[in-house]
């Protein structure tokens, strides 16, 4: 019996780990344990409820206005003690959060193998995204098994001469969509529940990254105002992150703008179904860059660079940056040029086929001599 401890702490991690946790629970050769740090308490709990995941351990480190040092210290201390007590055969971490890095480091201190889900994403700019780029690089150094979503991610790891074994699996976020997107979905959020998505074109907007707080987010808000002023059939829905630094910018700039709907963050099922009903998505989220192509939705990436260049190369996304004029012009083009819109909407999703969790479980079993290796995602 392989004891697998899955560690995560934020909503994006939970969305991507949930289908993997469900697969691990089905495997008779695995004892699956889950620890959450609750780095993002409220939004994490939404995902756990949706996927019916009950953590075995909850470190509950969330504090108001905590800084990165607080998160790192509290997560590392709690995880070090827990891993020492449980002595798992492998610790799984996901992505690039502070919890990810702390979990990998705590496992390393106990000489326990680390499996890194979503390994090998890179922008090659240490401050963008911040602190995620360094978190995932350091996690890569500490990991024994690297579950790379794409071949490009594997190439990034090989260039860095990482130790351990690399498996190309696809991204587990595509697996999650199989659980969540339903044609007859009834929204939990009351504002969304009362919307007629057949009336006009809806743009889904999300922006919350640390590097965008300040002038970049102000530029994004100004571009949004111009978009709704220029297109009478367009409505913008913005689930605004609970971070006070984000809300202090967004609400004064957009709260009273006609056809812009500012709502609280929604649960993952509402979010995925909102994406499925949107005409266009504007986002600085990494996960949404992966999810939207699976739903046939063009994406304007509100960042200067992306660690997911596969989306740009496949033609499912375009790099919008954080300048007002460029964001507006890109949105305008997709709203006016039907041919350009269709070209992006119908491009092939480069991030997965819905079987990433299955491949990761099989890879873990293979490493412990209980299975053949999985077939690669390509």
From Swiss-Prot:
Annotated keywords: Cytoplasm, Isomerase, Lipopolysaccharide biosynthesis
Keyword presence, Isomerase: yes
Enzyme class: isomerase
Subcellular location: Cytoplasm
Catalysed reaction, written as an equation: UDP-N-acetyl-alpha-D-glucosamine = UDP-N-acetyl-alpha-D-mannosamine
Family of the protein in this entry: Belongs to the UDP-N-acetylglucosamine 2-epimerase family.
Protein name: Putative UDP-N-acetylglucosamine 2-epimerase
